[in-house]
Amino acid sequence: MDSALSDPHNGSAEAGGPTNSTTRPPSTPEGIALAYGSLLLMALLPIFFGALRSVRCARGKNASDMPETITSRDAARFPIIASCTLLGLYLFFKIFSQEYINLLLSMYFFVLGILALSHTISPFMNKFFPASFPNRQYQLLFTQGSGENKEEIINYEFDTKDLVCLGLSSIVGVWYLLRKHWIANNLFGLAFSLNGVELLHLNNVSTGCILLGGLFIYDVFWVFGTNVMVTVAKSFEAPIKLVFPQDLLEKGLEANNFAMLGLGDVVIPGIFIALLLRFDISLKKNTHTYFYTSFAAYIFGLGLTIFIMHIFKHAQPALLYLVPACIGFPVLVALAKGEVTEMFSYEESNPKDPAAVTESKEGTEASASKGLEKKEK
């Protein structure tokens, strides 16, 4: 997981090619402000819209859009898995040719990026297609066995609009594969981030605290303790980071001196912020206090990261500042409102778990019957 915010004075990884060994001219204050302002905006968009879509996703009945629920056990293991993955990538780049590794990774993320971008733009297609558009339904079905022993391996339903989205996303994919252009990189990065915030759901606030706390330690260790994360971030030519050129004003779209923000700094706080939005809705008070508080906390934390980075002239682990802000601000609000118990007792069931679904239905029916009994009395 790439989670470091790069230091423009120490050089950034280039999304369009290998790192330039020659000394680059210093970026102008205007260029730096534009770059980091754009990174901040790009980070906020998938968090805001991903959180809104996560609410519809939790209520939806489409099996292909069911969220993946992260439990406390998953959260505790995640920093260990992320560390092993990061160290493995670092060793691969040290042992094998960087060119061949990035070629394989490019093909892998080419496919993933097309699917993620297609899923991202699909909801907007209804606004662009006329009502008379022939939207035909399709089904991709793979089964194993026959008769009573037949099992579904793949059962995917889609329509003509989904095929149009796939075609448009493929154009971006080919552009990225051939040019590694920073705009194509960002389109894929934004799609990955939005899909992550939308489809990855924490089951409760305690799990969110475990996940963010573990990755807080992970981020600090791998950025300050070693050069592993920064090395991987600069070597890894894949859309796992948002980038923006600091020399855009001088070189236009061919600019190549990039500031970057890892997708982990967007998705990890983003899924916690999305959880707080769903908690707000569960309170049924027609306010989104905790969502807006955590959203403002994210802006504060990322802004502080950028400020500290320029003071110390060193790449910063953004989660060092984002985690205390995104957890601390909402908890302080909950303390002030006397809703700490409600916040930490809020629980989301896994929609893919039949037992949880049954339990949820039984709970709903019980609540409804109690409500009827009260009305009769």
Swiss-Prot record:
Gene Ontology CC terms: cell surface; cytoplasmic side of endoplasmic reticulum membrane; Derlin-1 retrotranslocation complex; endoplasmic reticulum; endoplasmic reticulum membrane; lumenal side of endoplasmic reticulum membrane; membrane; plasma membrane
Effect of residue 10 to Q: Abolishes N-glycosylation
Cellular localisation: Endoplasmic reticulum membrane; Membrane
Positions annotated as glycosylated: 10, 20
Organism superkingdom: Eukaryota
Active site: 219, 265
InterPro entries: Peptidase_A22B_SPP, Preselin/SPP
Annotated consequence of substituting residue 219 to A: Abolishes proteolysis of PSEN1
Resulting phenotype, residue 264 to A: No effect on proteolysis of PSEN1
TM segment ranges: 32-52, 78-98, 101-121, 158-178, 182-202, 210-230, 257-277, 291-311, 315-335
Entry's Gene Ontology BP terms: cellular response to oxidative stress; in utero embryonic development; membrane protein proteolysis; membrane protein proteolysis involved in retrograde protein transport, ER to cytosol; signal peptide processing
Motif PAL in this chain: 317-319
Keywords: Cell membrane, Endoplasmic reticulum, Glycoprotein, Hydrolase, Membrane, Phosphoprotein, Protease, Transmembrane, Transmembrane helix
Cytoplasmic side: 53-77, 122-157, 203-209, 278-290, 336-377
Tissue: Widely expressed with highest levels in kidney, liver, placenta, lung, leukocytes and small intestine and reduced expression in heart and skeletal muscle. Expressed abundantly in the CNS with highest levels in thalamus and medulla.
Topology with respect to the bilayer: Multi-pass membrane protein
Family: Belongs to the peptidase A22B family.
Functional description taken from the UniProt entry: Catalyzes intramembrane proteolysis of signal peptides that have been removed from precursors of secretory and membrane proteins, resulting in the release of the fragment from the ER membrane into the cytoplasm. Required to generate lymphocyte cell surface (HLA-E) epitopes derived from MHC class I signal peptides. May be necessary for the removal of the signal peptide that remains attached to the hepatitis C virus core protein after the initial proteolytic processing of the polyprotein. Involved in the intramembrane cleavage of the integral membrane protein PSEN1.
Domain notes: The first transmembrane domain may act as a type I signal anchor. The PAL motif is required for normal active site conformation.
Subunit structure: Monomer. Homodimer. Interacts with RNF139. Interacts with DERL1 and XBP1 isoform 1.
PANTHER family hit by this protein: MINOR HISTOCOMPATIBILITY ANTIGEN H13 (PTHR12174:SF23), SIGNAL PEPTIDE PEPTIDASE (PTHR12174)
Protein name: Signal peptide peptidase
